[in-house]
Amino acid sequence: MSRSIRIGAAVAACAVMFVLGWGVAKTGVGQAVPFASLTDLERDFTGRMQNVVLVGHFTIEGRETRGGSPERYEIASVTKIDEDQWRFDVRMVYASVDVTLPVVVPMVWAGDTPMVSITDFSIPGLEGTFTARVFFYTDRYAGSWQHGQY
């Protein structure tokens, strides 16, 4: 093998490792705050969010339909990965979207209620940005979403 091919292969391998490293850091894969260090509320939340399905309806402003359109979020797990960063391993099904991926989002607490709070937030694998406030209380969820122009 010629020297230039070996150098090219080494550069390509470095580029692939960089992209993989960036992806792992961005998604928080492999990271987790030790379970023992979670508060009681955080432990309760992670327990409730194991292998759950959130089913609801959404509307698009200006195009509301009676009852809305169906949405479905299949959550395999939720993991705290940093002070206010949580990873949702989720399958999202809404409109023409059907994707499974890890999504790392900031979470804030309103007393005993966890809330995802994102503004102009990019989710790798999905186009556009998202703004949302979604809260979870016992076995319920509710919130407001905006995706791109909708």
Feature-to-residue mapping (PLM):
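Amphipathic/hydrophobic helical signal segments and adjacent flexible N-terminal regions
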Residues: S2-M49, V53, H57-R66
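Central antiparallel beta-sheet cores of small beta-barrel/beta-sandwich binding domains
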Residues: L41-E42, R48, V52-Y150
